[in-house]
Amino acid sequence: MSDVPSAQGKAAALLARFDAARDAFLAAFAQAPDAALPYTPAGDEYALGVLPPHLQDTMNHYLDVYARMADAHYGPVDLAADPARAGREAERHRRLVVTKPTGADRAGLLGNLAATHQRVHERFAALDDATVARKADVIYSAGTDPYPTSVADIFGWLTDHYDEHSEQTGRLLAQWQSEGTQ
């Protein structure tokens, strides 16, 4: 028996890791009481409760990157060629920075995250290994060199992003508790 994955083995393995990272984030986020959701420690931009929509924005960003890669048939993609894109991203960032979710927002935040996570699943689940590994040169911002990007890379970044914010959630919660802000 070969260790070579099936035609869709690589996508399935990446999706499994992506799901596990999501589950770890959800477990960490579930530990945060509603009162902690608006907490923003000094030096941070985002409130604890903004992490789900922040994760969602990143997934939407990379779904768009992949759509552009596929539309270009894996030819070069220049995200900086869309001058309105930077403005939209800056506005989304600004909106997240000023958002201070409450417990009443929790179900909606998590529902939206689940829906976006599912869209990632639906978009990538049926891809074969060759497509998952295929790279396109993507210019992410003006003045930068193209970065060879594949679906496997995108999954790595999204999985790492969940992991980063799982750890951050624990740290923010501990900091919130130590400051006696509950």
Regions found by a protein language model. Give the residues of each.
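Individual transmembrane alpha-helices with interfacial aromatic-anchor signatures
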Residues: G143-L158
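Helix-loop segments that flank and shape redox-cofactor active sites
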Residues: A24-G49, R68-P76, D128-P146, Q175-E179
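Long, hydrophobic/aromatic N-terminal blocks
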Residues: M1-D34
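Alpha-helical transition-metal enzyme core signature, strongest for iron centers
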Residues: F18-F25, L48-Y66, R85-R94, T99, ...
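Short hydrophobic/aromatic segments of transmembrane alpha-helices and their interfaces
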Residues: D19, D34, A114, Y147-P148
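Terminal "cap-and-tail" regions of soluble proteins that handle hydrophobic small molecules
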Residues: S150-D153, G170-Q182
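Short, helix-capping/interhelical loops that line the mouth of catalytic, cofactor-
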Residues: M1-A13, H61-L113, W176-Q182
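A structural signal for alpha-helical segments
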Residues: S6-G9, A13, Y39, G43-V50, ...
